[in-house]
């Protein structure tokens, strides 16, 4: 059952690390509910199900908000090992006008979140591709800005560093991938 869910999430908020551990990311959207009975006081955070078990690890919880000054995220993707790429909001969900214009790397084993450097200034970013392309331990993400053409950035999860690659003469890039020849 869990394997099917891992492969069919509409908005990805969990993933399996290479060692089989499953990380579940909660953006804590319930903070924004109008009905007080539905609201939560819990931070956006991460819990884990260790490989070979079916229960949440009672000793594992890391607050995303504690590491970001109260910011949350909209989605996440597994890159390699226990590294995950998160699409981050620019402010707390309890504020108005928040937008997802930043990327961060989450390291499962340590629970550390690090913002990706090497990207254009967040105030210039108008969008990201729908899903990164992942190959050989790197994520490739389309980044659209309000100045110039969109570009593909190669993201090294270990250093949380993005390197600008090719720019495309277009207004937006929704995704990036690689074609393989069929035999």
Where are the predicted features?
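Repeated scaffold domains used in trafficking and secretory/extracellular systems
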Residues: 4-14, 66-80, 123-133, 168-182
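Short coil/turn segments that connect the beta-strands within blades of beta-propeller domains
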Residues: 19-21, 80-83, 135-138
